[in-house]
């Protein structure tokens, strides 16, 4: 039995600070061991949308505790982490820089690889986290100003069927993916 990788994921692309520990089962399917999310909705509510500087400041204040809680809740030890991944974009640059800087420093301190993750690709693949969904599949990705209709053909293989720059609300908050079975 080979050792399954343990990945620490960090997300700070907009107004949520999040950390998760993920591994895989014997079949190679992802297993989420912990997923800690701190929302900033209350911080930005009075402004009618996300204020990037306030969002970045909140990430800086919370990221240590969020990552520690993700590790604690996973039941695993920090020494068991095999790699650290952080969202690299698209997103608000001041927010992304918090997660990227923290993730790179954390990986460096552990002498582990660092993985920069495309925010939209993460959304495109997230339906596979909790299902036996097979490629190809159709995906409606609604994320701020990057809404797309995709044929997800495999890891790194996407065909854009349509796109829209329209926000879904005054705040570019991510909306979870909707999916339909593909007949292709």
Language model regions located:
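Single conserved hydrophobic/aromatic residue that forms the stacking wall/gate
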Residues: 167, 172-184
């Amino acid at each position: 039995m080979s050792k399954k990788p343990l990945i620490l994921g960090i997300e700070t692309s907009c107004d949520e600070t999040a950390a998760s520990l993920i591994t895989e089962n014997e079949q190679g399917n992802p297993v989420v061991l912990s997923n800690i999310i701190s929302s900033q909705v209350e911080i930005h509510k009075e402004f009618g949308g996300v204020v990037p500087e306030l969002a970045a400041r909140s990430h800086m204040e919370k990221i240590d505790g969020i990552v520690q809680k993700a590790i604690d809740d996973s039941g695993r030890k920090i020494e068991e982490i095999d790699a650290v991944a952080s969202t690299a974009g698209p997103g608000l640059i001041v927010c992304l820089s918090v997660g990227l800087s923290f993730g790179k420093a954390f990986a460096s301190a552990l002498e582990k690889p660092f993985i920069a993750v495309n925010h939209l690709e993460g959304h495109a693949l997230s339906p596979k986290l909790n299902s036996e969904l097979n490629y190809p599949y159709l995906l409606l990705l609604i994320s701020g100003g990057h809404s797309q209709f995709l044929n997800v053909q495999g890891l790194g293989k996407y065909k854009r069927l349509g796109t829209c720059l329209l926000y879904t609300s005054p705040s570019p908050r991510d909306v979870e993916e909707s999916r339909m079975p593909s007949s292709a």
